[in-house]
Amino acid sequence: MSGSGAMLLGLLILVAMATSLDTREICWHQSECDDPNEWCCIMGTSYGSCQPVCRP
């Protein structure tokens, strides 16, 4: 395996670990949240995350 390939693999593993730690669902619309008490909070970009309270 080349150096750049190993680096890319390591990066993918880091991203996978980071996303698995974040238990919030990624959403685009309120209806995508499994919990009816949660809102789809848009985080400055096009998608958001399901949270009970949206912080500014």
Curated annotation (Swiss-Prot):
Coiled coil: none annotated. Residues 1-23 form the signal peptide. One of its GO terms (molecular function) is toxin activity. GO terms for cellular component: extracellular region. Keywords: Disulfide bond, Knottin, Neurotoxin, Secreted, Signal, Toxin. Expressed by the venom duct. Disulfide bonds join C27-C41, C33-C50, C40-C54. It is found in: Secreted. The cysteine framework is VI/VII (C-C-CC-C-C). Probable neurotoxin. This is Conotoxin Cal6.41c. It comes from Californiconus californicus (California cone).
